[in-house]
Design a protein with these regions (language model features):
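Extracytoplasmic beta-strand/coil segments of soluble accessory domains associated
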Residues: 37, 41, 71-111, 135
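Short acidic/polar hinge/loop motifs at secondary-structure boundaries
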Residues: 107-137, 188
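A beta-strand signature from Gram-negative outer-membrane beta-barrel systems
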Residues: 123-168, 742
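Gram-negative outer-membrane beta-barrel transporters
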Residues: 168, 374, 422, 546-559, ...
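Transmembrane beta-barrel wall of Gram-negative outer-membrane proteins
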Residues: 178-213, 217-264, 293-295, 368, ...
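Flexible loop and strand-edge segments within Gram-negative outer membrane beta-barrel domains
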Residues: 227-233, 247-304, 320-330, 335-338, ...
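Membrane-embedded beta-barrel scaffold of Gram-negative outer-membrane proteins
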Residues: 300-304, 310-329, 486-488, 494-513, ...
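C-terminal beta-signal and adjacent terminal beta-strands/loops
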Residues: 503, 593, 651-667, 691-743
Length: 743
């Protein structure tokens, strides 16, 4: 889709938007400092050479009421974030062209050793107080932050003595009020404070109906990766706290989240040639429905005046179990003639991961040199992940153990009474990955018979068998650096330049399970070396009077990046290639002469390329599985008295993917790979929401896809160009009515 100048001008006159999270709470308490816990410092964001957004509670609840999840809310507000797939799996969803680290109170939810892409659905938004976004590669939270950090901060301790809490009731319906499209949600949070002790307990339950597209057809199901539609989700949450002194506090926080598919529908193939999307019909899919379960417990002790500084400590345990659904047609990857005749064997997989970790940091102004603030810290993480085939109890991805020990230091020097700040730091990562000897699935060595094979080449069922792989303990250690300069010539106006390095482990599971050659030794297997990426950034921010504006140019590279490419069936494999990404993000929001009305606009342009032939030079565009489209965000918000409202439009701009393989495919009259079909056509979607505060709670009415626009989602439009079971339309007009009461 291309935006003409008249369309942009006329739309801008009506709407405006911002990618930066609204700061309603901050505006209500303008003098209260904003502390971003994900940045590992109590210094305000303006003192850091980073692009940071904080999505406050009101904005988050508003967006969740429209779209249904924290992930959708963040993707809507952030132009450089990929549009979500509206599925349980977030595979291919990126921030600035790389995978972000999802965290809850700093506890990593991502499982990079075998990325099940379920990390966006590990807690219900009902229990999230705010979301902190740090953009670009960094190692502030350790492994996983190559695209940035999405830290979900849960509800805080109660501030008033006695009993308080919150209740939520919500109903959702599609445009034509189909009986199978109805959904509902109920949540309750109860808090009690008695002197130094406080307790919080809560539960949330959500039943989602089937989604319908803009042409009143059921949105297709991805049985394997999982769905949020036709599902039930439960979340239990608890927090216990005790103030040991005026400045010291102990907190114990626990959460259990589970989302399960109902298993009432099966997929109906679409037709890419005619533009007919995948749909769904009543039926019972085989095996267990796709599901996601996450359990976490964290114990922390903080003291804001420990030896004159701020001390933070945390130990945590996190366990997840991601069940991938089965397909009606047996999956080729799981076939093994030693178990059952080929094309008759049913199976499905499940990721199992558990983490144990600890974090410590101490921050204070240096005695005798108060302009210099220093932070010393140490992080430790143990992660064990495997992927099993649960119908036949086979191992698909062998258990992989990850161990990280990381001391770090950060400094921030205030010069010329705050006119200039110089910040910098280092983190030493010492990592070990352990994988025992294992045997790959039988299908990894399968060769299909074809007239094109050289004479005498083994093929057919005799080639099933897999290979034995020698395990090992590859190690990695590196010093990850960051630094930057901030200049603030006037209050509310600042410019900054920064450099930061981040790292993550590649998807070791995808790599390990795909080995199909003998003689492989994990200790010397290049493909499992960690991904080290850097982020260079130049930015300007203006927050003065009615204006809230920012602009940032960023570029990053990684010599051994990670690229998802289609494999056997609908599975994706990993390739390690050099990757370079650059982009620009601009946001503007302004108050208007109309009291309570704010307008703004957000724009992001991102280019990403990789080295397709290992010559050290990037030559091919990253496709839609690996990078987001360019986008314009527009919205208008209104807040006055008991009434608040928003109208927002997201324009996802068309994109053509170029490279040698695409050029060769286009030059072939038969177009065997159909790579041109992966070009993105673009689309736009408008949402709206209105809220009124009554004397007994607030009423909110929200509409997703206000004009019932029919479109093919970005992920479907840019991958698997011959797969008619993975051609999904986006959700059509959807109504949500909610009642929210705090006491």
């Amino acid at each position: 889709m291309r935006l003409t100048l008249p369309v942009l001008l006329s739309t801008t006159a009506l709407f405006a938007g911002t990618a930066h999270a609204q700061q309603a709470a901050a505006e209500a308490e303008a003098d209260a400092p904003i502390i971003v816990t994900a940045a590992r410092t109590i210094l305000p964001p303006s003192a850091l050479p980073l692009t940071i957004d904080v999505v406050d509670k009101e904005t988050l609840d508003q967006q969740i009421a429209i779209s249904g999840s924290v992930t959708d809310a963040i993707a809507t507000l952030t132009p450089s974030f990929s549009p979500t797939r509206q599925k349980l799996s977030g595979a291919g969803e990126t921030l600035r062209g790389r995978s972000p680290l999802y965290a809850i109170n700093g506890i990593p939810q991502s499982t990079p050793l075998r990325d099940g892409a379920r990390d966006g659905f590990t807690i219900d938004g009902f229990f999230v107080d705010r979301v902190e976004l740090i953009y670009g590669s960094n190692a502030l939270q350790g492994i996983g932050g190559t695209g940035g950090i999405v830290n979900q901060v849960t509800v805080g301790a109660p501030q008033q003595e006695g009993l308080s809490g919150r209740l939520l009731l919500q109903g959702t319906a599609d445009n034509n009020f189909h009986s199978d499209g109805f959904g509902w949600k109920a949540g309750g949070l109860f808090q009690y404070k008695a002197g130094d002790f406080d307790a919080t307990v809560g539960a949330a339950y959500e039943k989602r109906g089937v989604f319908y597209d803009g042409q009143d057809r059921r949105v297709g199901l991805n049985l394997t990766q999982g769905e949020t539609q036709d599902s039930r989700a439960t979340n239990f949450f608890a927090r216990l706290g005790y103030a040991v002194s005026d400045t010291g506090r102990i907190d114990l926080i626990a959460s259990r989240f589970e989302l399960k598919g109902e298993g009432d529908f099966i997929a109906l193939p679409g037709n890419r040639a005619t533009g007919l999307p995948t749909s769904a019909v009543h039926g019972t899919p085989p095996g267990k429905a796709a599901a996601n379960r996450t359990e976490s417990v964290a114990l922390s002790y903080t003291d804001s005046s420990f030896l004159g500084g701020n001390f933070i400590s945390q130990i945590f345990f996190n366990r997840s179990r991601d069940t991938f659904g089965g397909e009606v047609a047996p999956i080729p990857t799981f076939q093994d003639p030693a178990i059952a005749p080929v094309n008759t064997l049913f199976d499905q997989s499940q990721n199992r991961s558990r983490k144990l970790g600890a974090k410590f940091s101490y921050e204070r102004a240096v005695p005798g040199f108060e302009a210099l603030t220093a932070i010393l810290g140490f992080d430790a993480l143990w992660d064990k992940t495997e992927q099993r085939l649960i119908a036949t109890n086979r191992v698909w991805v062998p258990p992989a153990e990850f161990r990280s020990l990381a001391p770090f230091a950060q400094t921030n020097l205030k010069l010329f009474d705050g006119l200039v700040r110089v910040a910098g730091g280092a983190r030493w990562e010492n990592v070990q990955i352990k994988i025992d000897d294992y045997h790959t699935l039988a299908s990894t060595t399968f060769v299909a018979c074809s007239p094109r094979l050289p004479a005498g080449t083994p093929c057919g069922n005799s080639t099933y068998g897999g290979v034995a792989v020698a395990g090992g303990k590859p190690k990695f250690d590196d010093l990850l650096l960051n630094g930057g300069v901030i200049v603030e010539p006037w209050e509310g106006v600042r410019a900054y330049a920064s450099y930061a390095e981040g790292y993550t482990a590649p998807d070791v599971g995808r790599i390990a399970r795909s080995v199909n050659a003998t003689g492989i030794d994990i200790d010397s297997y290049l493909a499992i070396e960690p991904i080290v990426s850097n982020n260079r950034e130049i930015g300007v921010e203006v927050k003065r009077g009615p204006i809230d504006a920012s602009a940032a140019y960023f570029w990053s590279s990684s010599d051994k990046g990670q690229l998802l490419v289609p494999g056997l069936g609908r599975n994706f494999d990993v390739q390690r290639q050099r990757i370079e990404i650059q982009g620009i993000e601009i946001n503007l929001r302004s108050e208007t002469p109309i009291d309570g009305l704010k307008l703004g606009i957000g724009y992001a342009h991102i280019d990403g390329r990789y080295d397709s032939n290992a010559d050290g030079k990037v030559d091919t565009d990253l496709d839609g599985v690996n990078i987001s489209p360019d986008r314009v965000n527009l919205s208008a918000t209104f807040n006055r008295g008991p009434l608040s409202a928003i109208v927002q439009t997201q324009y996802f701009l068309s994109r053509r993917f170029q490279g040698p393989a695409r050029a060769a495919d286009d030059a072939n009259p038969l177009r065997p790979l159909k790579l041109g079909d992966n070009d993105f056509g673009g689309y736009h979607v408008t949402d709206a929401s209105i809220r009124y505060q009554t004397g007994f709670g607030s009423l909110r009415f929200s509409v997703q896809n206000l004009f019932d626009k029919f479109y093919i989602d970005y992920s479907s439009d840019t991958r698997l160009p011959t797969d008619n079971l993975a051609f999904f339309a986006g959700r059509g007009r959807t109504f949500t009515l909610s009642w929210d009461y705090s006491f």
